[in-house]
Amino acid sequence: MEEIVKFLKEAETYYLATVEGDQPRVRPFGTAHIFEGKLYIQTGKKKDVSKQLHANPKAELCAFKGGEWIRVAGELLEDDRIEARESMLDAYPALKKMYAADDGNTEVFYFKNGVATISSFTHEPKVINF
């Protein structure tokens, strides 16, 4: 899982796809954090992405760097513990300008049944199940 987070952090921006009804929705994200052995992302409860993940937790993200790309698919489930939110905000201190662990808005999700695929045009894909 460390390889996945390293890739995402080096890419700096990844694109998270969710579904709203029958319409795909994609937006840029930047948080990727390991907490208690799980891959986490962060958003705000007021955002559409939060509502979409609660309605349908199946999601996929994609990032590109240096001629390689990664796709990470799975279910994103909310972890409502303050410890999980604090860990994310400690890993991304710049977020503390907009979020606080106890603000009622900060929300973290972790991947369940995750599958990451790292691909390029020059080598076979590497699949990581987590």
Locate the predicted segments by residue.
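Charged, gly/pro-rich active-site loop segments
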Residues: 71-130
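Hydrophobic/aromatic beta-strand elements that line small-molecule binding cavities or substrate pockets
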Residues: 29-32, 74-76
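Absolute protein N-terminus
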Residues: 1-3
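General beta-strand recognition
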Residues: 15, 39-40, 60, 71, ...
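A short mixed-secondary-structure module that forms the rim of ligand-binding clefts
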Residues: 32-67
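A short, Trp-centered hydrophobic/proline-enriched beta-strand micro-motif
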Residues: 6-20, 59-61
